[in-house]
Amino acid sequence: MPNTPKEGSELRVNGPEQNDGNVEYKLYLGSPSADRLDRLVTQMRYRLAQGGGEAFYELGVSDSGELVGLGEEQVREVLAVFDRVAKSAGAEWRVTRRVRGKEGDVLEVHVRQRLEAAVQIVVPLLGNVDSGKSSLVGVLCTGSLDNGNGEAATRVARYLHEIVNRRTSSVSTHLLGFDGSGKTVNDQLLDPLNESQVYLRSRKVAVLVDLAGHERYLRTTLKGVLGHTPDYALVVVASNMGTVGTFREHLGICVVLGIPFAVVITKVDLDPYNVKNTLSDVERVLKLPGVNKIPFIVDTQEDAVLAARHISSGRIAPIFLASNVTGAGLDYLRTFLDLAPPRLEWEKRVDQDLLVYVDDKFLVKGVGLVVSGMLLQGRVSVNQEVYVGPFPDSTYRTVKIKSIHVNRVSVDSARAGQIMSAALAGVEYAEVEKGMVILSQKTKPQAVQEFKADIHVLYHPTTIKPGYQSVVHVYTHRQPAKIVSILGRDTLRTGDKGTVIMRLMKKPAYLYRGQTIIFREGRTKGIGRIIEVYPKTAEAIRASQPPT
């Protein structure tokens, strides 16, 4: 809403209506003519498109942002017209907040487009080991509270050793679904972790990516973040541990990648003194130069709505105080995940050429090779022939898509923004590696061994010189790379920016201009953007038909 949520809050959302974005102000709708109704429907579709299928309407608010308000009779009239507009636009709506204006009530209405596929956001959970990330995922997705001894985490563990050690070491995804009224779908199912049923019955799906918190698994955590192209992130910190371990590093990943994030302080059922100290530490870290966020403590449903409204700006950092044992604060977090709109405009990428970085691979009995990954661009269909590669000899091969699953549901096709699993014919399990790509046959495949990048050294204990080696991460691809040369200078130190030529040490990869890279080695870390690639010669790149 265009008012301050509570006394003393740092959040300010006053201001006139913007032409872009998914927020629309309406002072009064009245009894529109047929032509006016058509314009309102077109306008709603535009706002929904701007918000990836979700929008907010402020009823009783002038274009300048003044909270005028509506009388009771006007509220009934406006909502009746609004219902007609929403139905014509193929959307559903609900009032999320109602506050007092100068002359009556101001209503905030959440609108969600009815789509063939559910509206989706991807949200990884980051934070130090033992902060309660997996338990939080387990509680949110099953609706059953934790016993205080990590039982909830075992419900979503991927491997036996994760249950035994009580420590996540891999990347796993779990669906939290919402129906049209904002209620969680998982709670309504016999098996709340049945992804296919959650997906099919939901209007909105939050894909929660559970990641490892231990420093030892940081490479896996980076792969999980980069490979899923998140809309937002939840950075989890335990109240009894504070901002220790990998908390700051994981927070830094969100900052350097430009991912808006919220902080979840767990275990608030323990010592209140620790909760207070941890909250103070988190607020201090969020205000540091380089992070520069406005902390916004969410302790009402109204705050949760506001947090969802403004998280995509990247300016605020909502803070949730939650307990996996008592359930305190979890309803606010669910509301936030339900209302937070998709940040990435996947519709604009659907018509581009297909691009999928392989995130994982499986050998399924009776099926053969199955690979998984997020569609970064384009669309793909069953029986379509695509390129897979590059292989160590810089070649690509033509393979056939035998079947596709999205969220464990068998589908005929998948599109940009969806995480799919696809069975491939024409290539062996041992030949395909994580970090390879699946490309449309319209794409000219290229295998890159060297590239030029603008980099920013976030930290290095001494100086970086030509010959320096680190591990480079690009989406799900990672391998050692060497700095061949530093253009225009001899060395780089902490805080320096420069242009370098880098060479992949083991094998070629599919890289292109504009991609973000992260490089790490020991305590050294940096980020960069590829500005030029040097593909292998055309003769070395070929696509062969699968054997008959």
How would you describe each model-predicted region?
Residues 81, 135-140, 172, 220, ...:
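Alpha-helical scaffold elements adjacent to nucleotide-binding pockets in ATP/GTP-utilizing enzyme cores
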Residues 49-51, 129, 167-169, 197-202, ...:
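Conserved catalytic network of the ASCE P-loop NTPase/AAA+ motor domain
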Residues 121-134, 138-142, 289-461:
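Conserved catalytic-core segments of large NTP-driven translation/proteostasis enzymes
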Residues 204-207, 211-218, 228-249, 255-277:
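Conserved Switch II/interswitch segment of TRAFAC-class P-loop GTPases
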Residues 59, 130, 136, 166, ...:
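Residue-level signature of catalytic and energy-coupling elements of molecular machines
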Residues 122-125, 270-273, 427-548:
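C-terminal effector modules of nucleic-acid-centric enzymes and ribosome-associated factors
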Residues 1-117:
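Polybasic/polar functional segments that serve as interface/processing modules
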Residues 112-211:
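Conserved G1/Walker A P-loop phosphate-binding module
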